[in-house]
């Protein structure tokens, strides 16, 4: 049985009534004939950080990539169920054009992956493929996105330099700025600090904490301490199933399911 709550207080208690931005309903996912996700039901609350935790191979990254239809890139993969996005105008992401889905949902990967372009063009890229060419508009969005990613002051005098010339932590913040530039409703983070040093990790965690006031965040993390530090809600997954979902503090201090208690207390994983 999955423990769920419709309201929660989380690691950083919210003062406002919570609204669902997204919701997974009865989701199954297959890699060919292999059933990787089993009857997943999960709410994602607006302007909150929701963490997906669990041991390697539990399905958390598989679930994350269902949101922006990344699995469509490989033949033989198959979805069953629904993933809804939007409060006032809900859309089933599994019935939309994948390109349109990715315009509404940003993603930041484990390893920084700046495009082989300048810092400026990395951020402007998403706008250009939408047909926006006005230089003043591009300049405004690039600066705003870099500021929101806490990178502007470090790169404002070198916007023509390659994105790959930045340090690892700076490259990851550049990727976050690139995701922010298209004004997404949801940003997916797939272990965004796993390839970074401790100082860069703190910087990214602080940035995520600040960004939740602007955008909803769903993050996969192997670090339970990271989930405690930055998330308001946590979902524990095991063998393709959602075992327990609740506000983060409840998951870590008073889990309902024994499997959850064993995992968060380090008995396996």
Swiss-Prot record:
Its EC number is 7.3.2.1. It catalyses: phosphate(out) + ATP + H2O = ADP + 2 phosphate(in) + H(+). GO terms for cellular component: plasma membrane. GO terms for biological process: phosphate ion transmembrane transport. GO terms for molecular function: ATP binding; ATP hydrolysis activity; ATPase-coupled phosphate ion transmembrane transporter activity. Transmembrane segments: none annotated. Residues 22-264 form the ABC transporter domain. InterPro entries: AAA+_ATPase (IPR003593), ABC_transporter-like_ATP-bd (IPR003439), ABC_transporter-like_CS (IPR017871), P-loop_NTPase (IPR027417), PstB-like (IPR005670). The complex is composed of two ATP-binding proteins (PstB), two transmembrane proteins (PstC and PstA) and a solute-binding protein (PstS). This is Phosphate import ATP-binding protein PstB. It comes from Thermosynechococcus vestitus (strain NIES-2133 / IAM M-273 / BP-1).
């Amino acid at each position: 049985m999955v423990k769920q709550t419709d309201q929660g207080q989380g690691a950083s208690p919210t003062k406002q009534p919570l609204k669902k931005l997204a919701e997974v309903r009865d989701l199954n996912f297959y890699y060919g004939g292999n059933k990787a996700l089993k009857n997943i039901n999960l709410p994602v609350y607006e302007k909150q950080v929701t963490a997906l935790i669990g041991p390697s191979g539990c399905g958390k990254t598989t679930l994350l990539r269902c949101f922006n239809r990344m699995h469509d890139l490989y033949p033989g993969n198959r979805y069953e169920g629904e993933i809804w996005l939007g409060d006032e105008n809900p859309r089933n992401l599994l019935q939309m054009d994948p390109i349109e889905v990715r315009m509404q949902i940003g993603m930041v990967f484990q390893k920084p992956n700046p495009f082989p372009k300048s810092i400026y063009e990395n951020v402007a890229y998403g706008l250009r493929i939408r047909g926006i060419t006005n230089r003043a508009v591009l300049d405004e969005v690039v600066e705003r996105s870099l500021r929101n990613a806490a990178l502007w002051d470090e790169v404002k005098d070198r916007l023509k330099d390659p994105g790959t010339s930045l340090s690892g932590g700076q490259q990851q913040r550049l990727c976050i700025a690139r995701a922010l530039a298209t004004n997404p409703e949801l940003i997916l983070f797939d272990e965004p600090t796993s390839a970074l040093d401790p100082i860069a990790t703190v910087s990214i965690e602080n940035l995520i904490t600040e960004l939740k006031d602007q955008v909803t965040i769903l993050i996969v993390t192997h670090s339970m301490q990271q989930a405690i530090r930055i998330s308001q809600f946590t979902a524990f997954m095991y063998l393709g199933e959602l075992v327990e979902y609740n506000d983060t503090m409840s998951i870590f201090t008073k889990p309902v399911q024994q499997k959850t208690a064993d995992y968060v207390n380090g008995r396996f994983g």
